[in-house]
Amino acid sequence: PTVWKAFDEWTAILAGDALLTLAFDVLARETTHRDPAIRIALVQAMARASGAAGMVGGQALDLMADKLGDPRTPTADHIRRLQAMKTGALLVYACEAGAILGHAPEAERKALVEFGTALGLAFQIADDLLDAEGDAATVGKAVAKDAAAGKATLVSLMGIPAARQMLAETEARANAALAPFSTKADILRAAARFVVARKS
């Protein structure tokens, strides 16, 4: 079960606050990297990914839609933006952090950010498809929740066939971003395949 189900909402909120604060503590430690410039870059990238321009901002957009009905008629662009911030930003960070730690050139860092962006979108589309057409026993959680709640997703907006097509195109875009790395990025290609093909 989720934390708020196992305990309660205030425990879940405080646990989230504590874990986010811990992330900055870990990144700032000398044991994370001996070069202070690298640690600063990691902290800055995490701040962007987790703050108003990332996870927290995306969650705010999601709550505005859920609780206030704003916007009244979400567009595909709005949903993509919300999902990129709420879910995708931390996946992008994981990719960018690797580039920072590896002293990657700017072009390679941008390529990994592009990969992470596509991976985040693919994850969300796949998740929405599982909710729309999966069965609870296989998925491992309740399904059809979005439709029951009247929540706008790319699947509800475009339909399942178009969402599947977008998922395939997004995986292709993720793989294209990895072209500069040749076979060294095969593990990332496998990660994208896993995200797209997962059944739970």
Regions found by a protein language model. Name each.
Residues 1-126, 132-176, 186-196:
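Mg2+-dependent prenyl diphosphate-binding active-site environment of isoprenoid biosynthetic enzymes
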